[in-house]
Each structure stands twice: as structure tokens, then as C-alpha cells.
Amino acid sequence: MKKKGGKAVRRRLVPSGEATIGPFFPQRYVDAGANDLTQVDDRRAEGEAIEIEGVVRQEDGTPLDNLVVEIWQADANGLYRHPADPRHGEADPRFFGWGRAATSKEGRYAFRTIRPGAPHGRARHVNFMLMFSGLMRILKTTMFFPGEQANESDPVYRAVPKARRALLVAREEVPGRYRFDLKLRGAHETPFFDD
């Protein structure tokens, strides 16, 4: 209500959109270079550099563009630069551990990072988070590396039914380059996790 001359004037309110991220999600939300985790301040991180790439698709196979893909992971020694990691003070100061990329019109994303070490009690992995306009919640998943014996004992990997676990494992296309496609719905939907 608005007051006019001491009287309240009723005005019809226009409801906002249902998109949780908002109808005006930025067209440019990702800085150039935010998808390269291999160095901080021109100092190269420890460990083997790898590439992770993929395509994000809807249920019908349509690629999703302007979707924000974030990743976070441990450094080459399995340590996170985060206060919740009891050994975070020992983490590689040249490895930020977090990156962001936007999908192209073809739904493609790409990251350059370091092959993570295995954090205590876990298999080596990379965490993913997806955000875009119209998505009612942030989607989170985890990518595991192929051929790792520790996958079978990882609590997150084991939380997914056996028949769907392969959807969490990247495919190594050539040494050091991994493909991890993400599908938002349907029979081959990527398993997504709640907090």
C-alpha cells in the first residue's frame, strides 16, 4: 500500500517469477579464467594437470546454455583449502580448489584443474554444482575417476544404487582428459544430492 494525502491507496502487486535464481540471471556470470584451477597468482599448483569437460542436457537431449557449473575439490594431497578441513593449513597455497564455468550454446563446459588426491576416507573426486534461471534448486553431484578401487568404499558413491553408479564416473578420453556429461532428467539422469 502507498499513502496518498494521508489515505492508503491500494495497488495491484505483480507477482515475481517462480525461478529461485531469478528471471534476470546474469548473461555474464563467469569471469574469464575462472575455469582454470591450476594456479593462483601465476604460481602453478602441485600435482598433475587434467582437463574435465562435458555437456549438460535436458531430458530430451537438448543442450542447456548459460548454465553455471561450479566445481570444488581437494588439492593433489587430498586437502581442502577450507576451515572445515582439519589440515587446511597444510593445503597447497597455489591451488584455490574452486572454479566456475558457463555452458556454451551447445551445453559444453570445461575446466583445467589438478588430479585431486583422495581426502581421508574418500575416493578422489570432484564436486559439481549447477545453477541457472528456471531451476528451482541448486543441483549438486560428485564426479569420480575411472579405475579407482577406492570408489567402491566411498560413502557418497555407495549411497547411489549400484545400477546408477556408472553415471557418477567420468570417462577418460585420452590420458589426462575426462568427460563428465550431465543429464537433468530421465532414465539416465545424473544422480544429484541434497546437502
PLM segments and residue spans:
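Beta-strand-dominated extracellular/periplasmic modules and repeats
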Residues: 2-195
